[in-house]
Design a protein with these regions (language model features):
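Conserved polar/disulfide-associated segments of primarily extracytoplasmic proteins
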Residues: 71-162
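Bacterial N-terminal signal peptides
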Residues: 9-19
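Stable alpha-helical elements in mature extracytoplasmic
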Residues: 50, 100-107, 204-207, 211
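Sec-exported extracytoplasmic/periplasmic mature domains
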Residues: 55, 109-116, 216-220
Length: 223
């Protein structure tokens, strides 16, 4: 199945639950601020609304830009379920460690429940856990982000049920950076995740960090 169709099906399925039309959701996903989130990679992806219809428990409002590794939905691939995404939210929405922990957990609980419900599988999402710890310093930050932005880095571990391919328990590891951008008057959360434990010499994590390092935001002050 093509990736764009997969994402659209997730959105449409969750939309039916929230009594919105698919057209409304698609329009909302494209209603982004006058900024461009630039990923210098060949990885493909999508832009969707925050909160996404499949995770109505989330409180953050804005946009999410995603880039999926080749092999993202191939359980036999070395890049299975490895990807990067960015949350872009207005400057009045703080991205503290506590908020990040709650929002990421709500995101993945909703995602798993939405997909597994279509497969008649109980996600048991209340048992999902997401541990988050702030790192001593932020390393490999986006080179186009001003040093004055003072990015904060976190390491995380999610225990959940992977819903797309295996419908089995999975552990995802996270490397997250957040910063405020005065040029666009927005806060950003850059997330790298993979079922592979984080490692300096791991090829998957090296690529994820390269994508983050080359990421940039273009545009003027948004909403």
């Amino acid at each position: 199945m093509k990736l764009s169709r997969l994402i659209l099906q997730i959105v449409i399925s969750a939309t039916a639950i929230s009594n919105l039309s698919a057209a409304d959701v698609i329009a909302a996903a494209s209603d982004a601020p006058d900024t461009t989130l630039v990923f210098n990679t060949t990885w493909k992806g999508e832009r969707i609304q925050l909160p996404p219809p499949f995770a109505p428990a989330m409180k953050l409002k804005g946009t999410e830009e995603i880039r999926f590794a080749p092999g993202m939905f191939d359980a036999g691939s070395a890049l299975f379920f490895s990807y990067a995404f960015v949350f872009s939210v207005s400057k009045d929405q703080a991205l503290t460690g506590d908020i990040i922990q709650m929002e990421i957990l709500a995101y993945y609980r909703g995602l798993s429940e939405s997909i597994l419900k279509r497969k008649n599988v109980n996600a048991d999402a209340d048992k999902f856990t997401f541990k988050l710890q702030q790192a001593k310093e932020a390393t490999g930050t986006p080179e186009k982000v001003a040093a004055s932005a003072k990015a904060v880095q976190y390491h995380g571990e999610l225990k959940w049920t992977e819903p797309f391919v295996t419908a089995k328990p999975q552990v995802l590891y996270f490397e997250i950076q957040s910063w405020a951008d005065p040029a666009t008057s927005r806060n950003y959360l850059f997330v790298c995740t993979s079922p592979k434990p984080r490692g300096d010499a791991d090829a998957t994590w090296m690529e994820l960090r390269n994508i983050r390092r080359s990421f940039e935001v273009k545009g003027s002050s948004g909403k």
